[in-house]
């Protein structure tokens, strides 16, 4: 007898007639007049539960099996048999069942068999992974995460753990969470009446990071190819389906690389990750196609078989101005493209993923390399049909004099970036990288539109439960 996951039984890894033990939670129980109960038991290893056929000859049939309800946990031992029922290849002829945990009051169990709205499930984030939709999201999220790590490992990248607590603002945006151990009821003050951060834990102002990019650049300038994969934080007071206060980012940095190199890397990474999901998680994708977004499988298959289009920002603006479409936000050179503009380009004009390159410098960050025209920077966005921007990246400014000029233009203090400037003083090198918002990727793959539903415990304005 061996411990078996439900997935391993369905994959045929246990011979018919072999005895296995499956451990999981009851989804449903159905009793027949012939004295047999049918238990649907799931363990999270795959989408479908396994059916356990439980005879009334078991000693605990009357006093335990017939009292099982949704959510009870069980340890079920039996023989693997081919299933006569539709939709599953194998089931378990149960010879022993142990109840590991009961549901106190089945009538008030929040995850009973009835269907809940996804909005309601957000209020029950500790229980929602027991539902079909959130369980499927979790498996797809894991698959994408593992695929991204595999991709970079196979490409010779080194994973770098960048700090979550920082004193620098990568984006120059100012929307950062402050980290402090000062007594909020009795803040120390300077002679000028300002908060005296010299008395704080780090002896200066500190924040939760908005990006690991600047730190990753320092390692790329020594190890050639690196990436980060971890949480980032934005104190942006936005209550929308596209914003989180805490989310995960994938950020590769490559030395001796230009914008075209990094665009090719982005395309290869996305296709690798999507192929992994199509190969490994078709059971979950089928559920999403049936119940969430019928286009998810076709969209991923189309994505991996498409060549990415490329267009300069200036040409993209001209396309949008001449397309005959009236947009909610009018298009002119110098604006940051909105979601409606991005989706038109990807879905209607190019009908494929598209890389928009060379944006106006005034709408981009200080670290992006200034182009020879003096007006644009070597920045890119990858736009995907169905969602718009999914990746943003750039060639980094490796020239110290130009970097200093950009810092001054954006009223950023050179002294705060002394270590970042050092990289341009000691063996500077052209380099490039991008950032991928991981939750946006999971949302795109699953069709689950609100990114609060693709991260286990969402953090948003006035939302920090659990």
Swiss-Prot record:
Q: Which cysteines are joined by disulfide bonds?
A: none
Which Pfam families does its entry note?
tRNA-synt_2 (PF00152), tRNA_anti-codon (PF01336)
Keywords, sorted A to Z: Aminoacyl-tRNA synthetase, ATP-binding, Cytoplasm, Ligase, Nucleotide-binding, Protein biosynthesis
Q: Does the keyword Cytoplasm apply?
A: yes
Source domain of life: Bacteria
| Catalytic reactions of this protein | tRNA(Asn) + L-asparagine + ATP = L-asparaginyl-tRNA(Asn) + AMP + diphosphate + H(+)
Q: Which GO terms describe its cellular component?
A: cytoplasm
Its Enzyme Commission number?
6.1.1.22
- Please indicate if the UniProt record lists Ligase as a keyword: yes
Q: Which CDD domains match?
A: AsxRS_core, EcAsnRS_like_N
Where is this protein localized, as stated in its record? Cytoplasm
Which stretches are annotated as coiled coil?
none
Q: How is this protein organized at the quaternary level?
A: Homodimer.
Q: Which NCBIfam families match?
A: asnS, PRK03932.1
The protein's name in its UniProt record: Asparagine--tRNA ligase
The scientific name of the source species is Shewanella baltica (strain OS155 / ATCC BAA-1091)
């Amino acid at each position: 007898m061996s411990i078996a996951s439900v997935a391993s039984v369905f994959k045929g890894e246990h011979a018919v007639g072999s005895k296995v033990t499956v451990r999981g939670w009851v989804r449903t129980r159905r009793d027949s007049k012939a004295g047999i109960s049918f238990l649907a038991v799931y363990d999270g290893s795959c989408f479908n539960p396994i059916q356990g056929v439980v005879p009334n000859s078991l000693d605990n049939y009357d006093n335990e099996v017939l009292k099982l309800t949704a959510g009870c946990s069980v340890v079920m031992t039996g023989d693997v048999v081919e299933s006569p029922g539709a939709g599953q290849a194998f089931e378990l002829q149960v010879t022993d069942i142990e109840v590991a945990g009961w549901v106190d009051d089945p009538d008030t169990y929040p995850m009973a068999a009835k269907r809940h709205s996804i909005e309601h499930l957000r209020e029950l984030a500790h229980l929602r992974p027991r539902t079909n939709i959130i369980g499927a999201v979790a498996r797809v999220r894991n698959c994408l995460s593992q695929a991204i790590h595999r991709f970079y490992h196979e490409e010779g990248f080194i994973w770098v753990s960048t700090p979550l607590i920082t004193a620098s603002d990568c984006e120059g945006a100012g929307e950062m969470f402050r980290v402090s151990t000062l007594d909020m009821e009795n803040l120390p003050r300077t002679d000028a009446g300002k908060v005296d951060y010299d008395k704080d834990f780090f002896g200066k102002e500190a924040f939760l990071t908005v990006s690991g990019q600047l730190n990753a650049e320092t390692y790329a300038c020594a190890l050639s190819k690196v990436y980060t994969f971890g949480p980032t934080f934005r104190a942006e007071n936005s209550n929308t389906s596209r914003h989180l206060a805490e989310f995960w980012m994938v950020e590769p940095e490559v030395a001796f690389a230009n914008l075209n190199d990094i665009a090719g890397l982005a395309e290869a990474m996305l296709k690798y990750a999507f192929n992994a999901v199509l190969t490994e998680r078709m059971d979950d994708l089928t559920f999403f196609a049936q119940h969430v977004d019928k286009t998810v499988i076709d969209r991923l298959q189309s994505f991996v078989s498409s060549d990415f289009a490329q267009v300069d920002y200036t040409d993209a603006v001209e396309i949008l101005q001449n397309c005959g479409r009236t947009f909610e936000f009018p298009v002119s050179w110098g604006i940051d493209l909105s979601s409606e503009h991005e989706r038109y380009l990807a879905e209607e004009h190019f009908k494929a993923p598209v890389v928009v390159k060379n944006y106006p410098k005034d709408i981009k960050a200080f670290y992006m390399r200034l182009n020879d025209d003096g007006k644009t920077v070597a920045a890119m966005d990858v736009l995907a049909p169905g969602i718009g921007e999914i990746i943003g990246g750039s060639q980094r400014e490796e020239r110290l004099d130009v970097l200093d000029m950009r810092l001054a233009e954006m009223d950023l203090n050179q002294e705060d970036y002394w270590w970042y400037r050092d990289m341009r003083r000691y063996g500077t090198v052209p380099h490039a990288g991008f950032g991928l918002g991981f939750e946006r990727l999971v949302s795109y793959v699953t069709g689950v539109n609100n990114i609060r539903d693709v991260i286990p415990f969402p953090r948003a304005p006035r939302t920090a439960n659990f």
